[in-house]
């Protein structure tokens, strides 16, 4: 996942994965 959205990944892994897709 993105480092900036690392905190978001801890809460919702799906959100982090979605940003990584782009």
From Swiss-Prot:
Q: Does the keyword Secreted apply?
A: yes
Could you say which protein family the record assigns here? Belongs to the ribosome-inactivating protein family. Type 1 RIP subfamily.
Q: Into which EC class is this enzyme placed?
A: hydrolase
Q: Which organism is it from?
A: Phytolacca dioica
- Organism superkingdom: Eukaryota
This protein's name: Dioicin-1
A GO molecular function annotation here is:
rRNA N-glycosylase activity
EC code: 3.2.2.22
Q: What GO CC annotations are associated with the protein?
A: extracellular region; Golgi apparatus; vacuole
- Biological processes, Gene Ontology terms: defense response; negative regulation of translation
Q: What does this protein do?
A: Nicks pBR322 dsDNA. Has adenine polynucleotide glycosidase activity on herring sperm ssDNA.
Where in the cell?
Answer: Secreted, Extracellular space; Golgi apparatus; Vacuole
**Catalytic activity field:** Endohydrolysis of the N-glycosidic bond at one specific adenosine on the 28S rRNA
Asked whether the UniProt record includes Cell cycle among its keywords, one would answer no
Q: Which UniProt keywords apply?
A: Golgi apparatus, Hydrolase, Plant defense, Protein synthesis inhibitor, Secreted, Toxin, Vacuole
Mostly located where? secreted
